[in-house]
Amino acid sequence: MLTERQSMILKYIIDDYSKTGVPIGSKALAEQLPIHVSSATIRNEMAVLSHQNFIEKLHTSSGRVPSNQGYRYYIDNLAKPAKLDTKRLEYISEMLDGSFQQIDEIVRQSADILSHLTDYTALTFSPELTTENTIKHLQLVNLGLNRMMVVIVMGNEQVESQSFLVTNQYIDSQLSLATNLLNQQLVGKTAREVKQVFQSKILTELHTYLPDTKQFVRAIQAILSKIDDDHYFISGQMNMFEQNGKQDFSKIKSLYSMFNNDNGIDALLEKSSKPISVKIGAEFDNDWLKDYSIITGSYDLGNHGIGRIALIGPMRMSYPNMLGVVDAFRHELKNRISGYYRSYDQ
């Protein structure tokens, strides 16, 4: 455990490095510290911090920079979320105050807002139930002109639809009977269980009311694929490369591959019970992320699940500022999505 003075020196080293990206020496630190301490005393304390691997020396400078261990100590013990100013809070509220037809529209917009606020790469995730999501209701809709649409409402109020072509003409009573049959067989089942149901005798019975069964099944399969997918959105990918200077092509290729891989994204984010968590450099499995940090925030929507947001930026980011943005943003997003669900439930 560090002493109060050692903690203060470490904090000022990290705060200065986040602003300048330049190693700092004892003389410059002496001018910044709020207490009167000689350069010699600071050098001694920095030697202790260096010996304990909280700071390290670069080959190109006599000054010191934070180490991974130093950043971890700083994040866990010294960095406090900065309060967001009124202007930025109003910007978030205004941008989330649009007319949205689906949750995913809000979540997609959120990624753009968060990236714009920070100039970092932002990820936003649709709320996910802690238990498996099941079908709440299914509806067949006749669109006319040989087109039909199937609409599925999930337990978390996620709504997905898919239109399909039909070769037969249908009257309302046929669609009503087909819809009733489908709801009897599918309500309460997960996407995985629904796939198994369609391998059973239900298709024979459904064909009685809906001869275009093959087209319907293809539409259902398209919806189930969307439901099974993690619903997340990314904005500002190029910021990752601009923030940390020149990057080699293989690293860029690896990062883009990660962004387009659900498993890669899941492995990237910190698994934590805390509302806000931070994962840094050496804690990533991939060497090409050693210069980055990820701040993840979650928001609890009760019966509607838990949503997540994340920021990816350079490890020398201003943690108080970014923690403050993530904290304020997750609260605003929770309020906006809660309002959507309230209007939907009415």
UniProtKB/Swiss-Prot annotation:
InterPro entries: GAF-like_dom_sf, HrcA, HrcA_C, WH-like_DNA-bd_sf, WH_DNA-bd_sf, WHTH_HrcA_DNA-bd, WHTH_transcript_rep_HrcA_IDD. Gene3D superfamilies: 3.30.450.40, Heat-inducible transcription repressor hrca homolog, domain 3, Winged helix-like DNA-binding domain superfamily/Winged helix DNA-binding domain. The keyword Cytoplasm does not apply. One of its GO terms (biological process) is negative regulation of DNA-templated transcription. Keywords: Repressor, Stress response, Transcription, Transcription regulation. GO terms for molecular function: DNA binding. Coiled coil: none annotated. The keyword Lyase does not apply. Negative regulator of class I heat shock genes (grpE-dnaK-dnaJ and groELS operons). Prevents heat-shock induction of these operons. Belongs to the HrcA family. PANTHER family: HEAT-INDUCIBLE TRANSCRIPTION REPRESSOR HRCA. HAMAP family: HrcA. This is Heat-inducible transcription repressor HrcA. The gene is hrcA.
